[in-house]
A protein has these predicted regions:
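Membrane-embedded alpha-helical bundles that constitute the cytochrome b-like, heme-associated redox core
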Residues: 1-235
């Protein structure tokens, strides 16, 4: 089933106006909000790991703040990675909308037509919005890019984690090749990892803006949809 933009105010079904459609299943919504918490935790702790707090003299047992920060970062990284695996699994067994950000139909001319329409809409060139049950094409591209960025962050993060644990650790054995791919310089991996953090922070800012904007201007629910699972058409 294609869920490209609908003409008119809201989609029609069985001869009557549809005001709500169940879109996002519980696992997708859970993944979304768990990922939100992970990104917040990883961004704050990652920044502090890159720019540590001033050293405090005294017994390490009572001044273990950076240790707790690193532990929170590593824990959130594990959760993010497990969540990504679960999200990919649900793309295989979930409904059509669970696959939208995994398999983007860039081979479809109709999809590109909708994509450029949405670009014009976001640039305030188009006067009236279209309705989408799931993600619009711009949203699909954005979320697919985020997924690949998150995968890169997990790979590079576990590579750096493995270097700290030692060459015999599972993390280094599984992801040590990432450092080799960057010329064997872990500082280069660290710099790209940090750039990835700022890129994801920028993505989050745009994502939140776009969701609130669409909620108001396109007259279809966005934020509440990721809570209830239902897309509401308001006109």
């Amino acid at each position: 089933m294609k869920s490209y933009g609908f003409d008119g105010n809201a989609p029609q079904g069985l001869g009557r106006k549809v005001t709500s459609v169940y879109v996002y299943e519980a696992p997708v919504r859970l993944w979304h909000w768990v990922t939100v918490l992970c990104i917040i935790t990883l961004s704050v702790t990652g920044y502090l790991i890159g720019k540590p707090l001033p050293s405090v003299p005294g017994e390490a047992t009572f001044n273990f703040v950076m240790g707790y920060i690193r532990f929170a970062h590593f824990t959130a990284g594990y959760i993010l990675a497990i969540g990504l695996i679960g999200r990919l699994y649900w793309a295989l067994v979930g409904n059509h909308h669970a696959r939208e950000i995994i398999l983007v139909p860039i081979w479809d001319k109709g999809w590109w037509k909708e994509f450029f329409f949405e670009v014009r809409w976001y640039m305030f060139i188009e006067r009236y919005p279209k309705k989408y049950i799931g993600h619009n094409p711009v949203g699909q591209i954005a979320m697919a890019t985020f997924l690949w960025a998150a995968v890169f962050m997990c790979f590079s993060g576990f590579a750096l984690y493995g270097e700290g644990l030692g060459t015999k650790s599972w993390a280094y054995q599984a992801f040590g090749w990432v450092i080799s791919a960057f010329g064997g310089n872990s500082l280069t991996v660290h710099n790209w990892h940090r750039l990835g953090m700022w890129s994801i922070i920028l993505f989050v800012m745009i994502h939140v803006y776009a969701a609130i904007r669409e909620d108001i201007m396109s007259k279809q629910s966005m934020v509440s949809t990721m809570i209830s699972g239902f897309r509401m058409f308001k006109d």
